[in-house]
Amino acid sequence: ESPISVDYRGLRVYECPPNGQGITALIALNILEGFDLAVMDLFSPEKMHVMIEAMRLAFADAKWYVSDPAFSKIPMQELLSKEYASERRKLIDPKRATVDPRRGSPVNSSGTVYLSVVDGMGNACSFINSNYMGFGTGIVPKGWGFTLQNRGHNFSLDPNHPNVLAPGKRPYHTIIPAMVTRVSDNSLYASYGVMGGFMQPQGHVQVLSALKDGGLDPQSALDLPRFCLDAESAGGRVDIEEGMPTATVNALREMGHPLNEVSGYERAVFGRGQVILRDESGVLCGGSDPRADGYAGSL
């Protein structure tokens, strides 16, 4: 299937289409494009607030619309339009959290591995694979030595939901490798991904913003503390990683965000990313997430 994309500040960001959740990151980036993140301090309360709110709005849509397009019509063009993003952006209160946002109406009618490879010519491979939830189903086909995946866990049992369980149907899928090119000449800007279930689109948005809006190199972008919205809803609890400035955490709480500060081994909830950035002269720069045992190297 062809990837889906949006333009973000001169870059073209590619994600996997539904039934994958890549559209979540693209919806959030469209919303965030209306805010001048580059002039905001790296961890200012204002910046963290709008990023969290954009992810909430994106998940509100994704949790409803992402399903198997062979079974349900998904308004892809409308969901990814700048006009729709503008309308959704108006729902963000700069002073208060929206804990339980509703999906929009765009039509007017846990055991994952990721790798990225880029060659000297700028050809790139962004690859991700997962059985889901550790060992998937835990069922090993006799004589084959691997476990079967359990992606059916992400079906809805609501008979009125587009992602409702049905024979021969693909469920909402979390794994989404990403690719970014420059709009001006279609040259490669970055090949990257962030493992971690429903953290993946959230990681994509935060890492890309750190690269483009923050001007950071891949390793520095991956090293930054992150936030993670609760996987079970578009709103609810927001996990905040240790290292986020105390003043920012306190300000977000005052805005109404229900925060949970996370440290130590529990930081696995924030995902594990890999990035290869290619500058305009063709020089490659890689980074690997310190939250896992990955590695950035050259051959």
What is the predicted function of each stretch?
Residues 22-38, 180, 184-190, 197-222:
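M16/insulysin-pitrilysin zinc metalloprotease superfamily fold
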Residues 1-18:
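Long, well-ordered, tryptophan-enriched scaffold segments
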Residues 34-131, 143-144, 151, 263:
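Internal maturation/activation junctions in enzymes
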Residues 91, 95-98, 102, 110, ...:
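Cofactor-centric catalytic regions
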Residues 123-186, 190, 200-201, 214, ...:
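Active-site rim segments in enzyme catalytic domains, especially the processed small/beta chain
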Residues 121, 169, 204, 213-267:
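Extended C-terminal subregions enriched in glycine
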Residues 14-22, 112-116, 126-139, 193-201:
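Glycine-rich phosphate/pyrophosphate-binding beta-alpha loops
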